Amino acid sequence: MPLNITQNLYNVAKQRMRERQIKINLLNYEYQTVDEIQGYVISGNINCDSNNDQRRSCSITLVLKENADFEIKSGGRIWLDRYVQIYIGEYNILAKDWEWVNLGIYLINTPTWNYDASTNSLSFEGLDLMARLNGTRNGYISDMPTTIPQGSNVRNAMINVLKLVGITKYVLEELPYALPYDIQVDVGDSVYSLLSQLRDVDATMEIFFDVNGVFRYQKIPSGHNEPSLLDDDVWDNIVTSESITSDFESVKNVVRVFGKSLDPTYYPSAITQSGNTYTLTIADYPTSFDNDTSFTVGWTASTAVASPYIKVNDNNALPLVNEDGTAAVLDRNNQYYVARYQNGKFIYLGYQQIYGEAKDDNPQSPYYVGSTIGEIAIPLSGGEYDNIYTNDLARQRAKYELYLRTRMNDSVSLTCVPIWWLDVNIVVSYTPKDSTVPKQYLVKSFSADIQESGSMNISMIAYYPQYESF
């Protein structure tokens, strides 16, 4: 979700002197405002972590401005059927007005109301809306085991799952391929478990609720072709400390992913090659096909070719294509390959042992394989990797794992005056204290103290434009 950064918000971010207010809207489950709480913050914090599906959380204690009844009970202002939407306001010295920023919508947890002759305070924790899906507040599957069959559209499957818990606000991207295997959860499992399995079909996707309470399923932003939304014009006014750490034990600059070991439906008894066409002799090969016909074929290619065709027995030669429809490339001599027949064409899956590799080949990276550190490799197999059923998906996963094991370890942490409109997975420009050259970073997490004198801690990873997007 793109940030809407106005000039007024930008100006306030540069102010050294801050005057701060908090406003809390009480919402029903239709996201309609039904009440409002105003007060002075005694303590509290806002947290956001892009590596956690429960992206946002908060904890707030405030002295109430009013002498209203905040008894925690059914039908009261604070109860299980309420969301809280938190706004932070800061006074704009130039515009002589308040600038308000939405910090997210939360479920109320552990509320406490204290009222006596000298006290009228309210404290609570705010849970990410994912708590409605993972069993914390709701989301258990109670009727019967649920199965999403192979071949299903992942986006449509997610929509149907969200309907189970009444989530109607969502933005879901399409995957270019269908669900490659059955997904099943048992009674007592959570809706979140089902959604996370659908997400994990492609390791480069993420699920989360944004600040407006919208459920999102999208590519994890890599920073590729994104503009910097913050630079030293702001940082120079607000940064109070900086730390740079590297976890050498976690650094890996070569990642090898071993996916599913494929067992083809049909094996040829003879193979011939003419140009880019392979002719396979298969005795028990089907003689009739319809739209539902699907099976796999395996064969050994003696030479590597581009834009190959597969001809079985006396049938017409059919193109071998990737799942996105582009022509496949057989990249190794004497390699055993597997393809799936579907809808009148062969879809390239990969080697019989699905495999993908990624290396840090960017000379600008401190973990470049051509530097003095050489190659530091890690093989990944078994468990969730067994669900990876094409070489292309294995390569994508390897690129993502490389990102986690290199760029996530080239990081900087800042302490600064809070920037309330900041969000995770945005690109910023910052000049480290030991350098005179600005570097680009991706914001990965932050935590902010919402008291008047509170500060913000920000964790960022280095972004290298030379990297291709994963």
Report residues per predicted region.
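Short acidic/polar beta-strand-loop edge motifs in secreted extracellular
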Residues: N45-N47, L133-I159, L172-Q197
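Exposed extracellular interaction/assembly regions and N-terminal maturation sites
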Residues: T265-N315, I347
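Assembly/oligomerization scaffold segments
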Residues: M1-S142, Q184, L195-T204, F208-V211, ...
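Acidic, small/polar-enriched beta strand-loop surface segments
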Residues: M1-Q32, S196, D200, M205, ...
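Short coil-to-beta transition motif at edge beta-strands of beta-rich domains
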Residues: G75-L94, D290-T296, W420-T431
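Short coil-to-beta-strand transition motifs
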Residues: K96-Y106, R332-N334, P432-L442
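Acidic, glycine/polar-enriched metal-coordinating patches/loops
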Residues: T303-G350
